[in-house]
């Protein structure tokens, strides 16, 4: 699924909008992706675009409380990934509600663990869907800032 999401971002970011699901399925199949993986990726994207905030407290977006990860979350999201999520929140890229949605979406991705690259991709897709990514410089800035953060 990760490879499909990377492919979609690389091919449709500049276009502004992705084609409809049927067109995407056809194009992804022609690109050589497996039908089951395509379905998983498109379902995941559909969930992402819904911004399902019903399971979260209404005031969470304004919260300044400290987040502690559960044992399950720590098994999937390593120290580097958790640090990156914390960094994004502290830098004002995401708010606490977006952080919770991000963690939920990362947990739902395929694979046993979530690499920093997967977390970055989820953030990029989320910001893209919310129209908070207006140009490529923001994308590049996110990666440059996060890379310099990782060196400290």
From Swiss-Prot:
InterPro entries: Smg. It comes from the Bacteria. Coiled coil: none annotated. HAMAP family: Smg. Belongs to the Smg family. This is Protein Smg homolog. The gene is smg.
């Amino acid at each position: 699924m990760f490879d499909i999401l990377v492919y979609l971002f690389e091919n449709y970011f500049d276009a502004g909008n992705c084609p409809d699901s049927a067109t995407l399925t056809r194009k992804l199949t022609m690109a050589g992706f497996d039908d089951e993986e395509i379905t998983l990726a498109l379902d995941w994207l559909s969930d992402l675009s819904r911004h399902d905030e019903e399971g979260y407290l209404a005031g969470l977006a304004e919260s300044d409380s400290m987040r502690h990860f559960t044992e399950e979350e720590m098994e999937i999201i390593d120290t580097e990934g958790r640090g990156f999520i914390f960094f994004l929140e502290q830098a004002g890229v995401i708010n606490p509600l977006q952080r919770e949605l991000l963690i939920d979406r990362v947990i739902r991705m395929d694979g046993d663990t979530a690499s920093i690259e997967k977390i970055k991709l989820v953030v990029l897709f989320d910001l893209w869907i919310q129209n908070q990514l207006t140009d490529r410089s923001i994308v590049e800035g996110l990666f440059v800032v996060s890379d310099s953060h990782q060196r400290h």
